[in-house]
Each structure stands twice: as C-alpha cells, then as structure tokens.
Amino acid sequence: MRIIDRACIAAAFVALATPAVAMDDQATYWRFDGRAEKRLSGIAPATEWAASAWIGDDSTKLRLYNSGIVGDSGHIDNEGGTKGIDSRFFYSRLIADFWDAKAGVSFTVFDGGVTRSGFVAGVEGLAPYGIHVDAVLGVSQTGVVSARLDASYDLMLSQKLIAQPYLEAMVASQNDPAIQLGSGLARFELGLRLRYEITKEFAPYVGVSFEQFTGNTAGFVAAAGEPTSLVRALVGLKFWF
C-alpha cells in the first residue's frame, strides 16, 4: 500500500472527527489523536503511524483506530503478523474511574494483499502510577486467538519535555504462516520517546526502540529473510485536537 492510501486513511479519520451536539442533556465530545513516526535502522527502515478518533460522552463512546507500518520500499511491514495496516471500530463504556471496556471488529491488511478480520474486545485506561494500558483480545476469521498489550507512561521532565517509556507485546494461540504469525509470544518491543510539547496539541519527538520476535514467529520472519531483532532510532510527531 502506497503513500496515497495512507492519505486516504487519514482523511477518513478527519471526516469522522466532526463537532458533536448535546444529546439527552449530556454533553457529547469528539477527539482525534495521531502519531507519525520514522523508524530508522540500517536494515529495515520504515514509516509508522497510529491514529484514533472517538465521539461520545463521559460514559459511552464510539472509537475508531487505525495504525500501520510501511517499509521504505513501499511494502506493508507485517511485523511477524502483529501489525500490517490495522483498522478497529469499538463501542466502549466506562466501567470504573479512568477505565473503559470496549468491544468491536477489526480488519487488517498485510503485505501481498492478505487480510484478516475478526472480533476484538478489551479494556483501556490508567493503571496505578499513571501507566496507560490498552489490552485487547481478538479472534480472527481463521480461528486464531490473540492478545495484545500496549503500555506507556509519561514522565514529566519539565513543563514541556516529557519522556515516555513504552511496551508492546502480542501472543497468539496458533500459527498463521500466511502472515508470519506464530503461536505463543510472537513479538515484544521496548522503547523510549522523548517529546517536546511546543503546544499541548503539537509535539515533535525522538526516541529509540528495541524489537524482538520470538518462538515460531521468529522462525517465519527469519525464513522470509527479515531480521528477528532490531534496534531503531525514532523521529516523529504527536498531535491531537
């Protein structure tokens, strides 16, 4: 998928993020968050993006997520079947202070036009000490059950300078060789992003990441001639409105 396709995806998010009106005497809001990132390495440089939009009130929301990673050659990076270009639509509801439960559907496009769709459900919110957690369980049309965890923490170094360590991990119930996904722990990534908030809504950043494929996933990735372990420098932009 080429750059023009990513532009279309971004346009769809902007179209979703239209001002809302009050319903049933409860204020309705919308928000759009985005991140665009260049991932630099001598082996597998790539461009990654992540965007989310929601509309709703304090207790219920409709959420749309889109993320993806594309290598410098223009091909979708499967990341061992853990990424591709992924779109998710959720209905979420507040279940506790700072915690939402959510359920919905997903559709992911991998390199070569291979696609996977399925049902997804999970929780998202703030754990103790302000750690942001997004945990999602999915079942694809091929019967693979997967669990994904994203966690991050904002450490305020000054009013404008924030360090954000983060963790990504995914496990799968069985092999899906068509997308290079193996059973067990498929992949984890540890990283640090250091951003400078020019305004609250606009923050460039730099960072570093360590990515490791494991188990059967590492075998599929190696068989495709791709590295199973990567250290990358990160340069990106975080924004919201």
Describe the predicted segments one by one.
Residues 35, 50-54, 88-92, 122-124, ...:
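Outer-membrane beta-barrel architecture
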Residues 1-9:
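Bacterial N-terminal signal peptides that target proteins for export
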Residues 17-19:
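N-terminal signal peptide c-region/cleavage motif recognized by signal peptidases
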Residues 88-164:
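Gram-negative (and chloroplast) outer-membrane scaffold detector with strong preference
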Residues 28-33, 130-132, 136-241:
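Outer-membrane beta-barrel transmembrane domain signature
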Residues 38-47, 69-85, 107-117, 137-148, ...:
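Solvent-exposed loop/turn segments connecting transmembrane beta-strands
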Residues 32-40, 60-77, 99-109, 130-140, ...:
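Transmembrane beta-strand segments that form the barrel wall of outer-membrane beta-barrel proteins
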Residues 2, 21-73, 89, 233:
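Outer-membrane beta-barrel initiation region
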